[in-house]
Amino acid sequence: MASTADFKNGLVLQIDGQLWQIVEFQHVKPGKGPAFVRTKLKNVVSGKVVDKTYNAGVKVETATVDRRDATYLYRDGSDFVFMDSEDFEQHPLPESLVGRLADFLLESMPVQIAFHDGTPLYLELPVSVELEVTHTEPGLQGDRSSAGTKPATVETGAEIQVPLFINTGDRLKVDTRDGSYLGRVNA
């Protein structure tokens, strides 16, 4: 059990038999009336996001989530195989659990896998990864009135929007949370 004072991003709550992760929270102290906590919760199984408000000081049930360091090894059909960094046990995760994060997975990449009662819940990647552009159209100077972007395919097969000056073979830093271009990596 945890109080609303213990809320933090990433905390997993158990509500009506389902696991919900706190994505955002805000303590609100209105001038009139009792304080409360406004939260944005994400269902760890379905990914559904809901807003929920708690009165300050309310106790809620938390779930024990074990985050383990692992390394991505390879893809086997529709499963992604990861090796636990502590006991070297291999964990195949289904494509449905990995989701769009598959666009940024590289072999030997360090990740974290969250488990609840021995069952994998979700995968966490580093905030940014370095990927090589395998294909993009050349950007022409002077063909636009303002700064623009173009699609580029990176080594994992994902397509991201990049500035016009990016060429095939460039290494990019990409945000794994939303797939956005962060910058070019100097070789």
From Swiss-Prot:
The organism's place on the tree of life at top rank: Bacteria
Broad class of the protein's primary localization: cytoplasm
An annotated GO BP: peptide biosynthetic process
GO CC annotation: cytoplasm
GO MF, any single term: translation elongation factor activity
Keyword terms: Cytoplasm, Elongation factor, Protein biosynthesis
Family label: Belongs to the elongation factor P family.
Function: Involved in peptide bond synthesis. Stimulates efficient translation and peptide-bond synthesis on native or reconstituted 70S ribosomes in vitro. Probably functions indirectly by altering the affinity of the ribosome for aminoacyl-tRNA, thus increasing their reactivity as acceptors for peptidyl transferase.
The name this protein goes by in its record: Elongation factor P
